[in-house]
């Protein structure tokens, strides 16, 4: 028998997986540190303050997430962010060694930079794979 004990609130979440996908939806935390050695990272409708996402082999996909500061690192795999908020004021640095960078459906070759006018930031570094950012 299972009994509901109410909501669980966590201000910080640190998660490391060796093999397997990570799917999180509706997460609301101040600090997220997520590392996946082999497997995809999928976040949907999450509210995050400071976040670090690291995938060795696997895709990273964020949909309708909000954040103040996010750093994403990928060795092999695509990174796709579809944000529900306007990031034009954010400091943004995107770069890939092998692959394409697209921002709002505009091809940017292998890198993109926006200085922004706020303290909010997004940094994505990818060794092999595409980066797509839509806001």
Place the predicted regions along the sequence by residue:
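Short, surface-exposed interaction patches in beta-rich subdomains
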Residues: 25-27, 31-33, 41-135
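Single conserved hydrophobic/aromatic residue that forms the stacking wall/gate
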Residues: 1-9
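Internal active-site segments that recognize and position negatively charged phosphoryl groups
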Residues: 20
